[in-house]
């Protein structure tokens, strides 16, 4: 089973791109997810999780969500590889979002 559930704030506005070969829309964004444990200075730390969504979900995220919004994401963890311009193999770990829920804007949280 490969299932991820995250709640965090969008770190910047999402970016959407249409894939030329398929015509599918892909939207990428990153959310900051607070850790439950504080560091040695007593401060909260966060993990910055890259998320990719496709199709209608991608269109809705790009249209309605912005930096600072609190969102819930459910999906799966994916690791993919590619070769860079020097021929080196690179690995990318990301969440492929199947559902994204708008929870609140940054203004509502204040």
Swiss-Prot record:
GO terms for molecular function: single-stranded DNA binding. Homotetramer. Residues 1-104 form the SSB domain. It comes from Clostridium acetobutylicum (strain ATCC 824 / DSM 792 / JCM 1419 / IAM 19013 / LMG 5710 / NBRC 13948 / NRRL B-527 / VKM B-1787 / 2291 / W). GO terms for cellular component: nucleoid. GO terms for biological process: DNA replication. This is Single-stranded DNA-binding protein 1. The keyword Oxidoreductase does not apply. InterPro entries: NA-bd_OB-fold (IPR012340), Primosome_PriB/ssb (IPR000424), ssDNA-bd (IPR011344). Keywords: DNA-binding. Pfam families: SSB.
